C-alpha cells in the first residue's frame, strides 16, 4: 500500500490533479481522532473516500483515547497504509489481539516509561510497530546522543521516529534532522531513524513539489498554518477535502 498505492498509483493521481486543476495534493495527511464518538465509521469514512479520489493512500492517525476503536476504520480501508500513533498505556492485550488480523497498519508507540511493556505486547502478537517521540528544545539530547535510537534497537523496532513540538526552534529541528539523516545514511543502528515531518515533506517534494503537510484536529479544524502565519479557517466535517485543498493549497494560492 505504501509503495504502490501511496507512492506510485496515488502519486500519479496527485500529479495529474496538480497538472489539470492546479491543486497541490499532499501524499499523506494526519487525522487526530476522538475515539469517544459512537460511530467513527460514519464520521470518518467519507474523509478516506475523498482522500483516495485525490490520490492519498497514506494516513497518520492519532488518538489519545482508545486506539482499538479505530481498528474498524483501518480494516475498512485495506488499500491504504495506516500509521496509528497511540499512547503506550493504551497498548493492551485486548488491543493487540484485535489488531492481529490487520496487515495495512504500523503502530507507533509513544516513548515514555511504559514503552518497553507496550512493545513487548506487540512483539508477542507479531505486530508491526515502532516508537515515536515528540521533542522540544530541551528534550533533543537523547536523540542527538543516539540513546533514543539504541533504545529502539533494544525494542526490536524497524523504525525510530521523532517529531518536533510546534514550539521547537528551527535550529534544533535542523540539528535533529541532520542527526537523523546522518545516522540513516551511515546505517548506524539496527533501526531506521525517521524525522516524521521533515521526511514526509521530503517525499512530498519528490512526488509533487512543493510539498504540503496538513492534518485535522478532532473537531475537524485544520492543523496547517498559512504562509501569512494565520491559521487557515477550514473544517473537514463542513467542507470537502477537494474544496479545502483547492481554496488554500492551489498552486496559484501558494505562489
Q: What residue spans do the PLM features occupy?
A:
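N-terminal [4Fe-4S]-dependent radical SAM core
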Residues: 1-31, 53
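Non-membrane alpha-helical secondary structure
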Residues: 2-6, 36-40, 114, 233, ...
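N-terminal start-of-chain detector that recognizes signal peptides
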Residues: 2-6, 57, 79-81, 186
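Long alpha-helical, hydrophobic tracts
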Residues: 15-18, 23-26, 44-48, 59-65
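Core AdoMet radical
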Residues: 28-40, 51-67, 77-117, 122, ...
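Alpha-helix N-cap and loop-to-helix initiation/capping positions
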Residues: 39, 43-46, 65, 171-175
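Radical SAM enzyme [4Fe-4S]-AdoMet core and its adjacent flexible, acidic
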Residues: 54, 80, 108, 116-255
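Domain-exit/linker segments immediately C-terminal to small folded modules
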Residues: 70-72
Amino acid at each position: 500500500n505504501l509503495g504502490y498505492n501511496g507512492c506510485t498509483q496515488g502519486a500519479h493521481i496527485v500529479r495529474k490533479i496538480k497538472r489539470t486543476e492546479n491543486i497541490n495534493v499532499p501524499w499523506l495527511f494526519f487525522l487526530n481522532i476522538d475515539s469517544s464518538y459512537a460511530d467513527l465509521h460514519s464520521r470518518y469514512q467519507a474523509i478516506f473516500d475523498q482522500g483516495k479520489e485525490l490520490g492519498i493512500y497514506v494516513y497518520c492517525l492519532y488518538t489519545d483515547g482508545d486506539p482499538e476503536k479505530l481498528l474498524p476504520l483501518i480494516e475498512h480501508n485495506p488499500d491504504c497504509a495506516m500509521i496509528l500513533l497511540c499512547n503506550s498505556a493504551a497498548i493492551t492485550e485486548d488491543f493487540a489481539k484485535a489488531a492481529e488480523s490487520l496487515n495495512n497498519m504500523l503502530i507507533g508507540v509513544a516513548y515514555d516509561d511504559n514503552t518497553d511493556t507496550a512493545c513487548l505486547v506487540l512483539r508477542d502478537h507479531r505486530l508491526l510497530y515502532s516508537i515515536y517521540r515528540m521533542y522540544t528544545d530541551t528534550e533533543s539530547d537523547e536523540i542527538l546522543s543516539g540513546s533514543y535510537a539504541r533504545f529502539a534497537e533494544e525494542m526490536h523496532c524497524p523504525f525510530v521516529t521523532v517529531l518536533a513540538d510546534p514550539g521547537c526552534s528551527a535550529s534544533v529541528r535542523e540539528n535533529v534532522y541532520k542527526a537523523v539523516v546522518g545516522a540513516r545514511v551511515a546505517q548506524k543502528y539496527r533501526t531506521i531513524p525517521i524525522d516524521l515531518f521533515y521526511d514526509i515533506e521530503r517525499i512530498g517534494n519528490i512526488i509533487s513539489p512543493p510539498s504540503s503537510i496538513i492534518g485535522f484536529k478532532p473537531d475537524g479544524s485544520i492543523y496547517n498554518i498559512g504562509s501569512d502565519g494565520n491559521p487557515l479557517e477550514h473544517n473537514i466535517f463542513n467542507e470537502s477535502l477537494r474544496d479545502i485543498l483547492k481554496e488554500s493549497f492551489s498552486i496559484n494560492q501558494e505562489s
